[in-house]
Amino acid sequence: TLFAAAGLGGEARIVGGAVRDWLAGRAVGDIDMAVNLPIQLIADRLRQIQHIKVINTGLAHGTVTVVDAAQSIELTQTRSDVATDGRHAVVEFQDDWAEDAARRDFTINALYLDAGGRLFDPLGGQADLAAQRLRFVGRATDRVQEDALRMLRYCRFSIDYNGAQYDKQAVEALRGFASLAAGLSGER
């Protein structure tokens, strides 16, 4: 793996949409990976590999993009949210995969695939995907208040996944916090 080539320990897992789409039998687009090592260490080591470009796309949030001739992959250090402002989070880096999953928006996006092809699904996202059920991770009201963009993502995913079963708690949260959408940028 790339980590072994860079002399890194730790673990990198594909996470989110790529895993979700693969499980759903859809074409996989962007690849995001969660990593349980300090992102600056990873970036520094990967920069030493010929033909690899590392872009600091969001170091404060633990994210870099790794680009080679074939593809680009976004790497983000495992983390938890310690504060939010309705759109952006203050994060704390850690190496607990379950905590990283708990900060994600939907159970179907809290799916991880390791280098051995093993699925890590701490929140039941695979079952939700199979049942075409769209659920927020934890309380829907908390997820929406943390990031208002999640309301739009809920609508998008419910359409993308063939009219996924509506979650009553989610619909109530969307109704209750609809005014937060006014604070989102126009391109969203």
State where each predicted segment sits.
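Catalytic cores of the polymerase beta-like nucleotidyltransferase superfamily
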Residues: 1-188
